[in-house]
Design a protein with these regions (language model features):
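Short S/T/G/P-rich N-terminal loop/turn motif that feeds into the first structured element of a domain
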Residues: 2-89, 93-206, 210-239
Length: 239
């Protein structure tokens, strides 16, 4: 059976944030989250979904996903968090020897209607794969239909765990052309084996051909499929 698809539409506002730590500062950044930020998020009505770092972390990155009841709640929670004296104290203490971050990226997301229920889960040791697709013009709907009708079930058939699927909110610059999702695998090698068998599946081949025939070409841009393997952090609710 497929994982429980949310019975009702998940109307929460999600935010995926990517932090780039200054050289030598990633451990300090993670300590600040572990000791302070995660708890303070909860205090201010922010739901922690998951925290990860790339397995090959050349850019000193932290990737995390949080959730809010609504976009309005999002703005209110961030404002209150930023003004919290406990946060200000923790931030100052952590930056005594210099700033921890060089860059922050953020995208506001909605759950797709075919995403499994977005809630933290912990399983046997596993690796995560963050995949981002950029579609050709006008084809985000077709890409979602292909996932809804075929891909999600085929991923499971070939040993992958479907976790979360999102598209950017309407006011985000990638709203018309991006799908972001997270899978889990037993290992990076298992992921490779799963994708090899998935791509050779006649059901997938037929679904891909039919969707591309309907669109008059590929649903994704050249170089429009990005994949990054992640490992969950010790303080991540999803691990």
């Amino acid at each position: 059976a497929l994982p429980s698809i949310a019975a009702e539409k998940d109307t929460r506002s999600f935010e995926m944030r990517t932090y780039y730590a200054a050289p030598g500062k990633l451990d300090d950044l993670l300590a600040r989250f572990r000791d302070h930020t995660v708890k303070l998020f909860e205090k201010h009505g922010i739901t922690n979904i998951g925290y990860w770092v790339p397995i090959e972390n050349k850019d000193n990155k932290l990737v995390y996903v949080i959730a809010f009841p609504s976009r309005e709640a999002q703005a209110k929670s961030w404002k209150e968090f930023g003004a919290d004296p406990d946060w200000q104290t923790a931030r100052k203490a952590s930056e005594k020897k210099g700033k921890l971050l060089t860059k922050v990226e953020s995208v506001f997301l909605n759950a797709t209607d075919f995403s499994p229920a977005i809630k933290p889960s912990a399983a046997a040791p596993r690796v995560f794969e963050l995949r981002t697709y950029t579609t050709t013009p006008g084809n985000l709907g077709r890409l979602q239909a292909r996932f809804r009708d075929h891909t999600v079930a085929l991923f499971q058939k070939h040993g992958m765990t479907n976790l979360f699927y999102w598209i950017p909110m309407a006011d985000q610059k990638t709203a018309d052309n991006m799908l972001v999702y997270l899978l889990a695998h037993a290992s990076a090698d298992a992921a490779k084996a799963s994708f090899t068998s998935f791509r050779g599946d006649p059901v997938w081949v037929a679904a891909k051909e039919a969707s591309e025939k309907d669109a008059g070409g590929s649903l994704t841009t050249p170089d429009g499929v990005k994949s990054e393997f992640l490992k969950a952090l010790d303080f991540s609710p999803t691990k």
